[in-house]
A protein has these predicted regions:
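Conserved MFS/SLC helix-loop-helix module at the cytosolic interface between two early adjacent transmembrane helices
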Residues: 55-91
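Paired small-residue
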Residues: 83, 94-102
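Juxtamembrane intracellular "pre-TM" segments in multi-pass secondary transporters
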Residues: 1-5, 178-204
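Extracytoplasmic
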Residues: 10-36, 218-223
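Helix-loop-helix hairpin linking two adjacent transmembrane segments in secondary transporters
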Residues: 130-177
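Extracytoplasmic gate region of multi-pass secondary transporters
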Residues: 28-29, 199-240
């Protein structure tokens, strides 16, 4: 059966999407201290991001099964873009919480969706390699974001640069085809409860839950800690 999409183009789009997630995960780190200097309560923003990432990660699966990958990738990227712009524009703490929630929610969807689509479009012989390359794109996005903030003092400029690049990629997503939706069988509540009888599954879930939480929040606070207690200059703390 002939595919209705280009595997290479879908893979490139997935890599771009996960790179955006890398930006989203580290977005607060370099700018949290400047925000706290002018806005009381900014240090609570990472908690809101964690809630957004959690919800996005949970909800993307049923939506993909029903509607497919393409427009969910577009919408999640647009939410991430709007979150970045909110951080660049707003000075009100409530609007910043809304922005960071959108950023986390969109990023959580991007993380799950991009891994899912790459796992679907490649067979067993290539899947592992392609997923490894995809994971490296997360690091690329995070590294580029860190370097931009290291060399540019005004944090709004990297936010705007990332937004422009993301807008161009969203246009690219709209122009290519993705694998169609594959509605799955109905999953009953008893099926879900039945998973609780596997202790190893629960253990791995708990480990990943706390690991992801620490990963998401530690990057936001590390720069502030190194600057305030480690004696590092702000630029050096950002690069760390």
């Amino acid at each position: 059966m002939q595919k209705s999409y280009s595997t290479n183009l879908v893979f490139i789009a997935s890599c771009a999407g996960l790179a955006f997630f890398g930006v989203a995960m580290l977005s607060l780190g370099p700018i949290l201290t400047p925000l706290q200097a002018v806005i009381d309560g900014a240090y609570a923003l990472p908690s809101t991001m964690s809630i957004g990432i959690l919800l996005g990660t949970i909800l993307f699966g049923p939506v993909v099964d029903k509607f497919g990958y393409k427009w969910l990738l577009v919408v999640s990227s647009a939410l991430t873009l709007m979150g970045l712009q909110g951080l660049a524009i707003f000075k009100d703490i409530n609007l910043l919480h809304l922005s960071i929630f959108m950023l986390g929610f969109g990023g959580g969807i991007l993380n799950g969706e991009t891994n899912a689509v790459v796992a679907e479009i490649y067979d067993d012989n290539k899947r592992g390699t392609k997923l490894a390359i995809l994971g490296a794109c997360y690091c690329v996005g995070a590294l580029i974001w860190t370097l931009l903030n290291y060399f540019i003092e005004d944090y709004t400029i990297p936010l705007n640069v990332a937004s422009v690049v993301m807008a161009g990629c969203i246009a690219f997503f709209c122009c290519i085809s993705f694998p169609p939706a594959k509605p799955s069988e109905n999953v009953t509540f008893s099926n879900v409860v039945g998973l609780l009888k596997y202790p190893s599954l629960i253990l791995f879930a708990l480990v990943l839950f706390f690991q992801s939480a620490f990963e998401g929040t530690s990057g936001s606070y590390t720069i502030s800690y190194l600057g305030n207690f480690g004696g590092l200059a702000e630029s050096d703390a950002k690069l760390s």
